Protein backbone atom coordinates (compact mmCIF):
# COMPACT_ATOMS: atom_id res chain seq x y z
CA UNK A 1 0.00 0.00 0.00
CA UNK A 2 1.42 3.40 -0.94
CA UNK A 3 2.02 5.79 1.91
CA UNK A 4 0.58 8.60 -0.19
CA UNK A 5 -2.77 6.83 -0.23
CA UNK A 6 -3.10 6.38 3.52
CA UNK A 7 -5.86 8.76 4.56
CA UNK A 8 -5.25 11.20 7.38
CA UNK A 9 -7.68 11.39 10.27
CA UNK A 10 -10.43 13.87 9.55
CA UNK A 11 -9.83 17.09 11.42
CA UNK A 12 -6.33 16.06 12.50
CA UNK A 13 -3.16 18.05 11.90
CA UNK A 14 -1.63 18.18 8.43
CA UNK A 15 1.85 17.74 9.90
CA UNK A 16 1.50 14.25 11.28
CA UNK A 17 3.31 13.45 14.56
CA UNK A 18 6.23 11.14 13.71
CA UNK A 19 5.27 8.66 16.43
CA UNK A 20 5.95 8.41 20.14
CA UNK A 21 9.12 9.84 21.58
CA UNK A 22 11.72 7.11 22.11
CA UNK A 23 12.88 6.72 25.69
CA UNK A 24 16.10 8.31 26.89
CA UNK A 25 17.73 4.93 27.41
CA UNK A 26 16.97 3.92 23.83
CA UNK A 27 18.42 7.17 22.45
CA UNK A 28 21.51 6.82 24.63
CA UNK A 29 22.02 3.23 23.53
CA UNK A 30 21.74 4.00 19.80
CA UNK A 31 23.92 7.11 19.76
CA UNK A 32 26.25 6.48 22.69
CA UNK A 33 28.54 4.17 20.73
CA UNK A 34 28.39 6.37 17.60
CA UNK A 35 28.85 9.83 19.10
CA UNK A 36 29.92 9.23 22.69
CA UNK A 37 27.86 9.05 25.87
CA UNK A 38 28.65 12.57 27.03
CA UNK A 39 27.78 14.14 23.65
CA UNK A 40 24.58 12.11 23.46
CA UNK A 41 23.52 13.16 26.96
CA UNK A 42 24.12 16.86 26.24
CA UNK A 43 22.26 16.75 22.90
CA UNK A 44 19.50 14.33 23.79
CA UNK A 45 16.74 16.58 22.37
CA UNK A 46 17.86 16.76 18.74
CA UNK A 47 19.11 13.16 18.78
CA UNK A 48 15.66 12.06 19.94
CA UNK A 49 14.24 13.67 16.79
CA UNK A 50 16.82 11.86 14.67
CA UNK A 51 15.82 8.53 16.20
CA UNK A 52 12.13 9.36 15.66
CA UNK A 53 12.91 9.89 11.98
CA UNK A 54 14.75 6.57 11.85
CA UNK A 55 11.90 4.68 13.51
CA UNK A 56 9.33 6.41 11.30
CA UNK A 57 11.12 5.51 8.07
CA UNK A 58 11.59 1.92 9.24
CA UNK A 59 7.89 1.75 10.04
CA UNK A 60 7.03 2.56 6.41
CA UNK A 61 9.75 0.40 4.88
CA UNK A 62 7.23 -1.85 3.11
CA UNK A 63 5.56 1.15 1.52
CA UNK A 64 8.91 2.55 0.36
CA UNK A 65 10.21 -0.69 -1.10
CA UNK A 66 9.70 -0.82 -4.86
CA UNK A 67 8.25 2.69 -4.93
CA UNK A 68 9.61 5.81 -6.65
CA UNK A 69 10.46 8.85 -4.52
CA UNK A 70 10.73 12.56 -5.34
CA UNK A 71 12.99 14.75 -3.18
CA UNK A 72 12.19 18.45 -3.66
CA UNK A 73 14.60 21.21 -2.67
CA UNK A 74 14.05 24.95 -3.01
CA UNK A 75 13.63 25.92 -6.65
CA UNK A 76 17.15 27.35 -6.55
CA UNK A 77 19.16 24.62 -4.87
CA UNK A 78 21.87 25.43 -2.33
CA UNK A 79 24.56 23.23 -0.72
CA UNK A 80 22.53 22.46 2.40
CA UNK A 81 19.53 21.34 0.35
CA UNK A 82 21.66 19.31 -2.06
CA UNK A 83 23.77 17.74 0.69
CA UNK A 84 20.60 16.79 2.59
CA UNK A 85 19.04 15.36 -0.57
CA UNK A 86 22.10 13.21 -1.30
CA UNK A 87 21.95 11.73 2.20
CA UNK A 88 18.17 11.14 2.07
CA UNK A 89 18.51 9.59 -1.39
CA UNK A 90 20.94 7.01 0.02
CA UNK A 91 18.68 6.31 3.01
CA UNK A 92 15.63 5.71 0.82
CA UNK A 93 17.72 3.51 -1.46
CA UNK A 94 18.73 1.49 1.59
CA UNK A 95 15.03 1.07 2.38
CA UNK A 96 14.39 -0.35 -1.08
CA UNK A 97 13.02 2.57 -3.10
CA UNK A 98 13.02 1.67 -6.80
CA UNK A 99 14.19 5.15 -7.88
CA UNK A 100 14.90 8.36 -6.00
CA UNK A 101 15.08 11.66 -7.89
CA UNK A 102 16.42 14.96 -6.57
CA UNK A 103 14.31 17.79 -8.01
CA UNK A 104 15.90 21.25 -8.27
CA UNK A 105 14.89 24.01 -10.68
CA UNK A 106 18.18 25.90 -11.04
CA UNK A 107 21.56 26.53 -9.45
CA UNK A 108 22.00 30.23 -8.77
CA UNK A 109 25.53 30.21 -7.36
CA UNK A 110 28.78 29.05 -9.01
CA UNK A 111 29.57 27.01 -5.90
CA UNK A 112 26.33 25.06 -6.37
CA UNK A 113 27.17 24.22 -9.97
CA UNK A 114 30.67 23.23 -8.86
CA UNK A 115 29.11 20.95 -6.21
CA UNK A 116 26.77 19.23 -8.66
CA UNK A 117 29.53 18.71 -11.21
CA UNK A 118 32.26 17.43 -8.89
CA UNK A 119 29.97 15.23 -6.79
CA UNK A 120 28.08 14.01 -9.87
CA UNK A 121 24.68 14.78 -8.41
CA UNK A 122 21.96 14.08 -10.95
CA UNK A 123 19.17 16.64 -10.80
CA UNK A 124 15.71 16.58 -12.36
CA UNK A 125 13.34 19.41 -13.26
CA UNK A 126 10.77 19.73 -10.44
CA UNK A 127 7.72 19.51 -12.70
CA UNK A 128 8.53 17.49 -15.82
CA UNK A 129 11.15 15.39 -14.03
CA UNK A 130 9.16 14.17 -11.04
CA UNK A 131 8.12 10.52 -10.75
CA UNK A 132 4.35 10.18 -11.27
CA UNK A 133 2.64 8.83 -8.13
CA UNK A 134 5.97 8.88 -6.30
CA UNK A 135 6.32 9.53 -2.60
CA UNK A 136 7.00 13.25 -2.16
CA UNK A 137 9.75 14.42 0.18
CA UNK A 138 11.21 17.86 0.88
CA UNK A 139 14.54 18.87 2.42
CA UNK A 140 15.69 22.27 3.68
CA UNK A 141 12.31 23.75 2.80
CA UNK A 142 8.72 23.02 3.76
CA UNK A 143 5.35 22.47 2.06
CA UNK A 144 3.37 23.54 0.23
CA UNK A 145 5.13 23.38 -3.12
CA UNK A 146 4.40 26.34 -5.36
CA UNK A 147 4.88 28.96 -2.65
CA UNK A 148 7.82 30.96 -1.26
CA UNK A 149 11.14 29.49 -2.45
CA UNK A 150 9.45 26.69 -4.44
CA UNK A 151 7.28 29.13 -6.40
CA UNK A 152 7.54 27.51 -9.85
CA UNK A 153 6.91 23.94 -8.67
CA UNK A 154 3.48 22.48 -9.25
CA UNK A 155 1.72 21.73 -5.94
CA UNK A 156 0.91 18.29 -4.53
CA UNK A 157 -1.51 17.36 -1.77
CA UNK A 158 0.41 14.59 0.02
CA UNK A 159 3.93 14.51 1.39
CA UNK A 160 5.79 11.59 2.90
CA UNK A 161 8.93 12.98 4.59
CA UNK A 162 9.93 16.60 5.28
CA UNK A 163 13.08 17.83 7.07
CA UNK A 164 13.65 21.58 7.43
CA UNK A 165 15.45 23.74 9.97
CA UNK A 166 14.11 27.07 8.64
CA UNK A 167 10.34 27.17 8.99
CA UNK A 168 8.10 27.36 12.04
CA UNK A 169 5.78 24.33 12.35
CA UNK A 170 2.72 26.49 13.07
CA UNK A 171 3.35 28.60 9.97
CA UNK A 172 3.78 25.47 7.83
CA UNK A 173 0.62 23.91 9.25
CA UNK A 174 -1.34 27.06 8.42
CA UNK A 175 0.11 27.34 4.91
CA UNK A 176 -0.61 23.68 4.18
CA UNK A 177 -4.25 24.06 5.21
CA UNK A 178 -4.61 27.22 3.12
CA UNK A 179 -3.24 25.45 0.02
CA UNK A 180 -5.14 22.18 0.32
CA UNK A 181 -2.36 19.89 1.56
CA UNK A 182 -3.93 16.81 3.12
CA UNK A 183 -1.04 15.32 5.04
CA UNK A 184 2.70 15.33 5.73
CA UNK A 185 3.32 11.80 6.96
CA UNK A 186 6.71 12.29 8.65
CA UNK A 187 7.20 15.98 9.46
CA UNK A 188 10.43 17.29 10.99
CA UNK A 189 9.98 21.05 10.67
CA UNK A 190 11.76 23.71 12.70
CA UNK A 191 14.67 21.43 13.54
CA UNK A 192 16.98 22.87 16.25
CA UNK A 193 20.12 22.66 14.10
CA UNK A 194 22.17 25.09 12.04
CA UNK A 195 21.79 23.01 8.87
CA UNK A 196 19.41 20.35 7.61
CA UNK A 197 22.46 18.42 6.38
CA UNK A 198 23.56 17.84 9.99
CA UNK A 199 20.20 16.25 10.83
CA UNK A 200 20.22 14.06 7.70
CA UNK A 201 23.86 13.11 8.30
CA UNK A 202 23.00 11.86 11.79
CA UNK A 203 20.05 9.96 10.31
CA UNK A 204 22.35 8.51 7.65
CA UNK A 205 24.70 7.39 10.40
CA UNK A 206 21.90 5.27 11.90
CA UNK A 207 21.13 3.78 8.47
CA UNK A 208 24.87 3.15 7.89
CA UNK A 209 24.91 4.81 4.45
CA UNK A 210 28.00 6.98 4.83
CA UNK A 211 30.16 4.44 3.05
CA UNK A 212 27.50 4.01 0.36
CA UNK A 213 27.61 7.67 -0.69
CA UNK A 214 31.43 7.71 -0.74
CA UNK A 215 33.75 10.71 -0.35
CA UNK A 216 31.75 12.86 -2.81
CA UNK A 217 28.48 12.33 -0.94
CA UNK A 218 30.06 12.96 2.45
CA UNK A 219 31.71 16.11 1.09
CA UNK A 220 28.34 17.31 -0.26
CA UNK A 221 26.74 16.92 3.18
CA UNK A 222 29.77 18.53 4.81
CA UNK A 223 29.56 21.51 2.46
CA UNK A 224 25.87 21.88 3.32
CA UNK A 225 26.76 22.20 7.00
CA UNK A 226 29.70 24.50 6.26
CA UNK A 227 27.83 26.98 4.08
CA UNK A 228 24.56 27.16 6.03
CA UNK A 229 26.45 28.03 9.21
CA UNK A 230 28.79 30.53 7.47
CA UNK A 231 31.87 28.32 7.90
CA UNK A 232 30.59 27.12 11.30
CA UNK A 233 30.67 30.69 12.64
CA UNK A 234 26.98 31.67 12.75
CA UNK A 235 24.31 29.46 14.25
CA UNK A 236 26.06 26.07 14.38
CA UNK A 237 24.93 23.62 17.03
CA UNK A 238 26.93 20.85 18.64
CA UNK A 239 25.43 18.42 16.11
CA UNK A 240 26.61 20.57 13.19
CA UNK A 241 30.16 20.57 14.54
CA UNK A 242 30.17 16.84 15.27
CA UNK A 243 28.68 15.80 11.93
CA UNK A 244 31.05 18.06 9.98
CA UNK A 245 34.04 16.65 11.84
CA UNK A 246 32.99 13.03 11.32
CA UNK A 247 31.99 13.52 7.67
CA UNK A 248 35.32 15.08 6.70
CA UNK A 249 37.63 12.96 8.85
CA UNK A 250 39.10 10.87 6.01
CA UNK A 251 41.57 12.37 3.53
CA UNK A 252 39.52 11.53 0.42
CA UNK A 253 36.45 13.41 1.66
CA UNK A 254 38.58 16.30 2.89
CA UNK A 255 40.20 16.62 -0.54
CA UNK A 256 36.82 16.75 -2.29
CA UNK A 257 35.56 19.35 0.19
CA UNK A 258 38.62 21.52 -0.50
CA UNK A 259 37.77 21.43 -4.21
CA UNK A 260 34.16 22.38 -3.49
CA UNK A 261 35.20 25.39 -1.43
CA UNK A 262 37.59 26.58 -4.16
CA UNK A 263 35.31 28.10 -6.79
CA UNK A 264 35.40 31.14 -9.09
CA UNK A 265 32.83 33.88 -9.64
CA UNK A 266 31.84 35.26 -13.06
CA UNK A 267 32.67 38.93 -13.81
CA UNK A 268 28.96 39.82 -13.71
CA UNK A 269 28.90 39.22 -9.95
CA UNK A 270 31.40 42.01 -9.37
CA UNK A 271 29.44 44.32 -11.68
CA UNK A 272 26.31 43.69 -9.59
CA UNK A 273 28.26 44.41 -6.42
CA UNK A 274 29.61 47.68 -7.83
CA UNK A 275 26.11 48.79 -8.85
CA UNK A 276 24.76 47.91 -5.41
CA UNK A 277 27.36 49.94 -3.54
CA UNK A 278 26.86 52.88 -5.91
CA UNK A 279 23.11 52.81 -5.27
CA UNK A 280 23.03 52.30 -1.51
CA UNK A 281 20.79 54.23 0.87
CA UNK A 282 21.94 54.58 4.47
CA UNK A 283 19.83 55.63 7.45
CA UNK A 284 21.61 55.14 10.75
CA UNK A 285 22.41 51.43 11.09
CA UNK A 286 20.22 50.49 8.08
CA UNK A 287 21.58 50.03 4.54
CA UNK A 288 19.46 49.29 1.46
CA UNK A 289 21.10 48.73 -1.94
CA UNK A 290 19.46 48.72 -5.39
CA UNK A 291 21.01 46.09 -7.68
CA UNK A 292 18.93 46.27 -10.87
CA UNK A 293 18.30 43.31 -13.17
CA UNK A 294 19.95 39.99 -12.24
CA UNK A 295 19.84 36.94 -14.50
CA UNK A 296 18.39 33.73 -13.10
CA UNK A 297 21.81 32.05 -13.13
CA UNK A 298 23.17 34.79 -10.85
CA UNK A 299 20.28 35.14 -8.36
CA UNK A 300 22.39 34.17 -5.35
CA UNK A 301 24.38 37.38 -5.74
CA UNK A 302 21.41 39.24 -4.21
CA UNK A 303 21.73 37.44 -0.86
CA UNK A 304 25.51 37.68 -1.05
CA UNK A 305 25.33 41.46 -1.48
CA UNK A 306 23.05 41.71 1.56
CA UNK A 307 25.54 39.67 3.60
CA UNK A 308 28.40 41.93 2.47
CA UNK A 309 26.46 45.07 3.42
CA UNK A 310 25.96 43.65 6.92
CA UNK A 311 29.74 43.42 7.31
CA UNK A 312 30.06 47.22 7.03
CA UNK A 313 30.87 48.66 10.43
CA UNK A 314 27.86 49.99 12.31
CA UNK A 315 25.25 48.08 10.28
CA UNK A 316 22.31 46.28 11.92
CA UNK A 317 20.02 45.77 8.90
CA UNK A 318 21.28 45.21 5.35
CA UNK A 319 18.98 44.81 2.35
CA UNK A 320 19.52 44.21 -1.37
CA UNK A 321 16.75 44.81 -3.95
CA UNK A 322 16.86 43.33 -7.46
CA UNK A 323 14.69 42.32 -10.41
CA UNK A 324 14.95 38.73 -11.64
CA UNK A 325 12.97 36.53 -14.00
CA UNK A 326 10.84 35.54 -10.99
CA UNK A 327 9.91 39.09 -9.99
CA UNK A 328 11.10 41.84 -7.68
CA UNK A 329 13.26 40.21 -5.02
CA UNK A 330 14.50 41.51 -1.69
CA UNK A 331 17.11 39.86 0.53
CA UNK A 332 17.60 41.00 4.13
CA UNK A 333 20.33 40.27 6.66
CA UNK A 334 20.31 41.67 10.20
CA UNK A 335 22.33 41.44 13.40
CA UNK A 336 21.09 42.53 16.81
CA UNK A 337 24.44 43.12 18.50
CA UNK A 338 24.19 46.92 18.13
CA UNK A 339 20.82 47.02 19.91
CA UNK A 340 22.02 46.52 23.47
CA UNK A 341 20.46 43.74 25.51
CA UNK A 342 17.12 43.62 23.69
CA UNK A 343 18.27 41.18 20.99
CA UNK A 344 14.77 39.86 20.20
CA UNK A 345 13.74 43.30 18.94
CA UNK A 346 15.55 42.83 15.60
CA UNK A 347 13.30 39.86 14.83
CA UNK A 348 10.15 41.92 15.39
CA UNK A 349 11.46 44.75 13.21
CA UNK A 350 12.29 42.47 10.26
CA UNK A 351 9.00 40.62 10.63
CA UNK A 352 7.12 43.93 10.47
CA UNK A 353 9.22 45.22 7.58
CA UNK A 354 8.70 42.18 5.37
CA UNK A 355 5.05 41.62 6.18
CA UNK A 356 4.12 45.30 5.81
CA UNK A 357 6.02 45.85 2.57
CA UNK A 358 5.43 42.40 1.03
CA UNK A 359 2.32 40.84 2.61
CA UNK A 360 1.92 37.16 1.90
CA UNK A 361 5.09 36.75 -0.21
CA UNK A 362 7.85 37.03 2.39
CA UNK A 363 9.60 34.78 4.83
CA UNK A 364 12.57 34.82 7.16
CA UNK A 365 14.55 32.76 9.61
CA UNK A 366 16.56 33.77 12.63
CA UNK A 367 18.83 32.32 15.25
CA UNK A 368 16.83 31.75 18.38
CA UNK A 369 19.76 32.38 20.69
CA UNK A 370 21.15 35.90 21.30
CA UNK A 371 22.65 37.70 19.56
CA UNK A 372 19.89 37.20 17.01
CA UNK A 373 20.96 37.05 13.37
CA UNK A 374 18.15 37.33 10.85
CA UNK A 375 17.92 36.23 7.23
CA UNK A 376 14.84 37.14 5.24
CA UNK A 377 13.52 37.71 1.78
CA UNK A 378 10.52 38.45 -0.37
CA UNK A 379 9.56 38.10 -4.01
CA UNK A 380 6.73 39.94 -5.77
CA UNK A 381 5.84 37.97 -8.92
CA UNK A 382 5.85 39.96 -12.14
CA UNK A 383 2.08 39.95 -12.44
CA UNK A 384 1.76 41.90 -9.20
CA UNK A 385 4.71 44.12 -10.05
CA UNK A 386 3.16 45.09 -13.39
CA UNK A 387 -0.10 46.03 -11.71
CA UNK A 388 1.65 48.12 -9.09
CA UNK A 389 4.61 49.79 -10.74
CA UNK A 390 5.99 48.84 -14.16
CA UNK A 391 5.96 46.49 -17.13
CA UNK A 392 9.04 44.28 -17.38
CA UNK A 393 8.73 43.37 -21.05
CA UNK A 394 8.68 47.01 -22.14
CA UNK A 395 11.69 48.12 -20.10
CA UNK A 396 14.29 45.34 -19.99
CA UNK A 397 15.89 45.95 -23.39
CA UNK A 398 18.91 48.27 -23.84
CA UNK A 399 20.49 50.83 -21.50
CA UNK A 400 17.20 52.67 -21.00
CA UNK A 401 15.53 49.45 -19.92
CA UNK A 402 18.33 48.61 -17.49
CA UNK A 403 18.14 52.09 -15.98
CA UNK A 404 14.37 51.74 -15.60
CA UNK A 405 14.85 48.46 -13.73
CA UNK A 406 17.48 50.04 -11.50
CA UNK A 407 15.19 52.98 -10.76
CA UNK A 408 12.44 50.50 -9.89
CA UNK A 409 14.81 48.93 -7.34
CA UNK A 410 15.69 52.37 -5.99
CA UNK A 411 11.99 53.09 -5.44
CA UNK A 412 11.63 49.84 -3.47
CA UNK A 413 14.70 50.79 -1.42
CA UNK A 414 13.18 54.17 -0.59
CA UNK A 415 9.90 52.48 0.33
CA UNK A 416 11.67 50.11 2.74
CA UNK A 417 13.36 53.03 4.48
CA UNK A 418 9.97 54.76 4.68
CA UNK A 419 8.43 51.67 6.33
CA UNK A 420 11.10 51.74 9.03
CA UNK A 421 10.65 55.48 9.55
CA UNK A 422 6.90 54.96 9.93
CA UNK A 423 7.61 52.23 12.49
CA UNK A 424 9.92 54.65 14.34
CA UNK A 425 7.06 57.15 14.55
CA UNK A 426 4.49 54.55 15.63
CA UNK A 427 6.66 52.44 17.97
CA UNK A 428 9.89 54.35 18.67
CA UNK A 429 11.12 51.86 21.26
CA UNK A 430 11.38 49.11 18.61
CA UNK A 431 13.60 51.12 16.26
CA UNK A 432 15.86 52.67 18.91
CA UNK A 433 19.45 52.39 17.73
CA UNK A 434 18.49 51.64 14.12
CA UNK A 435 17.55 54.96 12.52
Regions found by a protein language model. Give the residues of each.
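Short alpha-helices
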Residues: 161, 165-246, 250, 355-357, ...
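Active-site cofactor/cluster-binding pocket
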Residues: 117-186
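Helix-enriched interaction subdomains in cytosolic or periplasmic regions
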Residues: 11-51
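Anionic-ligand anchoring segments at beta-strand to alpha-helix junctions in alpha/beta enzyme folds, i.e.
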Residues: 68-131
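Mixed-charge interfacial surface used for oligomerization/domain docking
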Residues: 229-324
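Gly/His-enriched, cation/cofactor- and phosphate-binding structural elements
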Residues: 38-69, 97-99, 281-435
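Divalent metal-coordination and catalytic microenvironments
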Residues: 78, 88, 137, 164, ...
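Short glycine-rich or small-residue beta-strand-to-loop segments that form or flank ligand, phosphate
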Residues: 69-75, 224-226, 289-290
